[in-house]
Amino acid sequence: MKLRLGMSPISWSNDDLPQLGGDTPLEVCLSETREAGFVGTETGGKFPKEAGALSAVLAEHDLALVSGWYSGTLINNDLESELERIADQLALFKAVGASVIVYGETYETVQNRQERPLSSRPKLDDYDVAAYGRRLTALAEHCAGKGVPLTFHHHMGTAVETEAELDAVMAVSYTHLR
């Protein structure tokens, strides 16, 4: 298998903190991504949300869509509601040929809430981890069935931040979650 590398647009501008590169145009991000030798990119807040427009802007820079962040809330949400929430992004990623969709658990995250200290982040132990794993597995199976596998991204300020928390989630999640 040939390895292809993609880049994240957060290297140019941060969707959570727009004061960090918020004035950097998408054109700069994409042209510099390609100039650096990357063949793909993740999505970000500045990217078109319609398949034709997204495909066109990527083609202008000879880039593929490799992935993109999805702010999930399965830890405190039912599967059917989450399937509705992810549907548009999943369809977009399928249409544009994304390799994966990146799930981050964002229920009650401290991100975008600068008045809250990191220590006030949600704690995984406050939730039914086994039930969460079952819902996460079902979502991953659904996404894989649509041709866009789901990957899991632990993140600072969320209920799944530490290595131990990530291990706990992975221990109760199954085959289709990467």
Regions found by a protein language model. Give the residues of each.
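Active-site groove signature of glycoside hydrolases
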Residues: 95-120
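Conserved small/polar residues in nucleotide/adenosyl-binding loops
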Residues: 175-176
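N-terminal pre-domain/capping segments
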Residues: 1-100, 126-137, 141-148
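Short, small-residue-enriched loops and turns at beta-alpha junctions
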Residues: 75, 108-109, 156-160
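Active-site loop/turn elements of alpha/beta-hydrolase fold enzymes
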Residues: 45, 70, 105-106, 155
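Glycine-rich tight-turn/loop motif centered on a GG-T
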Residues: 118-128
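Hydrophobic, aromatic-enriched interface-forming segments
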Residues: 149-170
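Short, glycine/charged-enriched secondary-structure capping and boundary segments
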Residues: 20-22, 55-58, 115-118, 164-167
